[in-house]
Design a protein with these regions (language model features):
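Rossmann-fold dehydrogenase core element
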Residues: 110-128, 147-151
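N-terminal Rossmann-like dinucleotide-binding module
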Residues: 1-51
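Predominantly a Rossmann-like dinucleotide-binding segment in NAD(P)-dependent oxidoreductases
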Residues: 15-16, 128-228, 363
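C-terminal helix-rich "cap/oligomerization" subdomain common to oxidoreductases
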Residues: 1-3, 10, 71-73, 109, ...
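Contiguous beta-strand/loop segments that form the cofactor/metal-binding neighborhood of enzyme cores
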Residues: 186, 193-285, 322-336, 368, ...
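Beta-loop-alpha module in the N-terminal Rossmann-like domain of NAD(P)-dependent dehydrogenases
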Residues: 51-114
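Hydrophobic residues in well-ordered beta-strands that form the structural core
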Residues: 17, 57, 96-97, 103, ...
């Protein structure tokens, strides 16, 4: 595809799409935002006008039929992701999907295999993989600066839904019954992905717990309070095939600023901490320590890890997503080899999420990969 602009159609014109996805596409001169779709046509028209798209529609299949659209970007409610992703791949489009690609890892495997069989590039909205600090730390690990990685600790937690009056996007998970995954899938997924990437190894076993700390919440669809039996806080331990170990925690009811991520890697020759939190006017810091200097000292992130015009004082939303969309454009246009953060990576993450859910409900370690029975007991 070298030599042409990349046509993009965005499905979903909500806040995250306006804050991160569409600004990322229009920031890249190699890309053209052709169309915006939303079930609320007014939102689609407003976003199209704001970002210069020539088409606004309430029917996503219209985007799939257009020859001037190469990439479909899915930024809808979680429950709609898989249907739209599948239709887009079947239509021969490259796909960027917000997480999760699907709630069940088996569905993620199906669509990952379909996309590969058709020679299509895919990407999951693992926003924080594209943070300059996170990417520079990956380069440091790969260079051997930390030696052999032993331990990975990570969390994503902030106050997004600490207030019960802050409405959730839908009432899909309202009611009683078994505790349903929420924070683990929304907040845990990005740091699980970074863990796989940093440790260069798959998780082989997990054990975890989930909690529902705020049982009643305002439901966006109804405007009323209701029982919402979801995990709003969780933690798990994991073992990697390499012999390394990890702890991962997520919550959207913990006091703290956005995005609220910290990842730590401890190796045989050093340790590093990437902290992605908007504090003191900047959105991230990177610190490193060595065996002969155990105080963690801030590391300057080279300019090449930032998008054009980017800096640590930019909003993390646009900063990280500009890197993500630029990376995907480069992959689709054939300017770089590979396809990182794709649906295969999404599969590995979703399988861990499903395994931790099993672990919580069955109170046991769960081995990976999952089998048809939902994981072997240990």
């Amino acid at each position: 595809m070298t030599g042409k602009r990349l046509g993009v159609g965005v499905v979903g014109a909500g806040r995250w799409s306006n804050w991160a996805h569409m600004p990322g596409w229009v920031r890249d001169p190699r890309c053209e935002l052709v169309a915006v779709c939303d079930t609320e046509l007014g939102k689609a028209k407003e976003a199209a006008a704001r970002f210069g798209a020539k088409v606004a529609t309430a029917d996503y299949t219209e985007l799939l039929r257009r020859d001037d659209i190469d990439v479909i970007d899915v930024v809808t409610r979680d429950s709609q992701h898989f249907e739209i992703n599948w239709a887009a791949v079947e239509a021969g489009k490259h796909v960027l999907s917000e997480k999760p690609v699907a709630h069940d890892h088996r569905d993620v495997r199906r669509i990952a295999e379909l996309a590969k069989s058709r020679g299509l590039k895919t990407k999951v909205g693992f926003t924080f993989r594209y943070s300059p600090a996170v990417r520079y730390l990956k380069a440091m690990i790969d260079s051997g600066a930390l030696g052999t990685p032993f331990i990975y600790n990570a969390y994503e937690q902030n106050s997004q839904w600490l207030n019960p009056q802050s409405p959730l996007r839908s009432g899909e998970r309202a009611g009683d019954g078994p505790l349903k995954v929420a924070s683990l899938e929304g907040y845990g997924a990005p740091v699980i992905d970074i863990g796989h990437w940093y440790m260069d190894s798959d998780l082989t076993a997990v054990v975890g717990v989930m909690r529902n700390f705020i049982p009643e919440r305002m439901i966006l669809d109804t405007g009323t309070m209701a029982r919402v039996n979801i995990d709003d806080g969780d933690i798990f331990l994991g073992e990697f095939a390499s012999g390394a170990i990890c702890s991962v925690q997520s919550s959207f009811v913990t006091v703290g600023n956005y995005p609220g991520i910290e990842v730590r890697v401890y190796g045989s020759e050093g340790a590093a901490i990437a902290r992605l939190v908007e504090e003191s006017g900047i959105c991230e810091t990177l610190k490193m320590a060595k065996p002969d200097d155990v105080e963690f000292r801030e590391v300057e992130i080279p300019a090449r890890y930032y998008p054009a015009g980017g800096s640590p004082r930019e909003s993390w939303r646009t900063l990280y997503y500009a890197n993500l969309t630029a990376n995907f454009a480069s992959e689709v246009l054939g300017e770089i080899d590979g396809n990182e953060g794709n649906f295969d990576d999404g599969l590995r993450v979703q399988e861990v999420i499903n395994a931790v859910e099993i672990s919580h409900h069955e109170r046991r370690w769960v081995s990976l990969p999952l089998d048809g029975a939902g994981g072997a007991a240990r």
